[in-house]
């Protein structure tokens, strides 16, 4: 995408880009793991970033030394984790989104760009409601409408589809390597922020959210 004129839409990962709920994920998984007698630390938690709840559980169960678990039991563990996580999410408020993020999204929207969320989380809408940011996005593609999580491109392709835009006209903003891989697999350009700002596959690398305005040709 050599010309900013081709950019018509921005698709944002949620966690680690718009909001930061890593600590809640960690606390919820750890509570479940501790109860099961499974070793779990922040290094293992880092492997869970950007992947689905089911895949996250399988990673955690690598340390499980008990009898093999049935699909039903695994589903119970995932529900247990999510219930704890949602309780923690209830503490979120509008203050959990920075003024810089809000202002940048507003400027992008006013400049005519369509905005979407592309997240593997099934709690995306709930989180956006809690931080009072649901109305900032034209579409939400999340864990409720996909069958494959990142690095599969499905979540971003669905977001583009919901926006009515072609993949080549969409730019993805991601903080995880798996998310950048998913964006490239979708044939979309990718902006790396946070950890992903060090990933060579990212087309753009930024340190601050407001740098998106330069990429969009607004500032």
Positions of predicted regions on the chain:
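Helix-loop "lid/cap" segments that line or gate small-molecule binding pockets
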Residues: 32-33, 54-69, 127, 160
């Amino acid at each position: 995408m050599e010309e900013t004129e081709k950019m018509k839409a921005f698709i944002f990962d949620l966690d680690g880009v718009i909001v930061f709920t890593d600590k809640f994920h960690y606390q919820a998984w750890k509570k479940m793991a501790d109860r099961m007698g499974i070793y779990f630390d922040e290094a293992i938690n880092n492997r869970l970033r950007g992947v689905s709840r089911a895949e996250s559980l399988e990673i955690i169960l690598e340390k499980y030394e008990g009898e093999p678990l049935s699909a039903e039991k695994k589903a119970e563990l995932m529900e247990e984790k999510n219930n704890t996580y949602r309780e923690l999410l209830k503490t979120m408020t509008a203050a959990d989104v920075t003024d810089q993020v809000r202002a940048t999204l507003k400027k992008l929207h006013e400049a005519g760009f369509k905005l979407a969320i592309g997240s593997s989380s099934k709690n995306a809408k709930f989180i956006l409601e809690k931080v009072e940011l649901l109305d900032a996005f034209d579409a939400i593609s999340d864990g409720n409408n996909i069958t494959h999580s990142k690095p599969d491109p499905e979540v971003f392709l669905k977001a583009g589809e919901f926006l009515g835009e072609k993949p080549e006209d969409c730019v993805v903003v991601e903080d995880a390597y798996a998310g950048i891989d998913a964006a490239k697999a979708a044939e979309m350009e990718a902006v790396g922020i946070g950890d992903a700002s060090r990933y060579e596959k990212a087309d753009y690398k930024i340190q601050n959210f407001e740098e998106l305005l330069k990429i969009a040709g607004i500032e």
